[in-house]
């Protein structure tokens, strides 16, 4: 059962084993009705932090794009639809490029898919840039409070379309026309949101290459909390924050700093396999839930 904006609704995810396979199927329900996983997005705004989120800094660009896409989709369902359309068009366009190379299709057929790709591509990349700037603004307020040292954090968007803010349909059509032969030779689309990326730097050095594990963890947590603040500013509603085992790799001073800071948020779920860590930070109004073999 969830409460948001004075509305009450029931969200659940059930796991079901698929017969004669080792696969597990997820069944999503919203107010007792079975829905698609994408229908969950935006129903309840949550910012979730786990160890895997360090890939925002050290992982490949696809993880950073996914981070942005989930963040934006929680605020704008039309963005999610544009992204879904774009991915389908991208698949079709890449197939046509391969067919042209094999002399099974013509360049004329490619023009239709290029136009469709650009239409959604412009919206996606421009919105990613805007929303990353919002996250960055909030993150830069948080990072100095969580970092032990006087460190400088920088977040920089790297769009596939250069100068994306000033480009229009005509500009991008020209750019694609200039790259047709290379794309046909390669059998794939060179430009577009599927190539977007962003970079995090600490003290003007790429964090993925030059930062310590502690710096990366602090920067990632700052980004996730910056995301929460950006969501709150956009939706006028504070998201639920779930922090999965963030304390175990922090020293005592940094752990104390993080815990004191996150208490500013309205609703937080903090998990740890070490109950002594939880007990060391608990206060009178906090609630502790013990989970054993899936039972609370």
Label each PLM-derived region with a short phrase:
Residues 1-63, 69-75, 79, 140, ...:
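Nucleotide-state sensing region of NTPase/ATPase domains
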Residues 55-56, 63-108, 115, 123:
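Long, charged N-terminal accessory/stalk domains
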Residues 101-240, 249, 253, 257-260, ...:
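Conserved NTPase motor "head" modules and their coupling/switch loops across ABC/AAA+ ATPases, GTPases
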Residues 244-246:
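Walker B catalytic acidic pair
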Residues 271-274:
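H-loop/switch region of ABC-family ATPase nucleotide-binding domains
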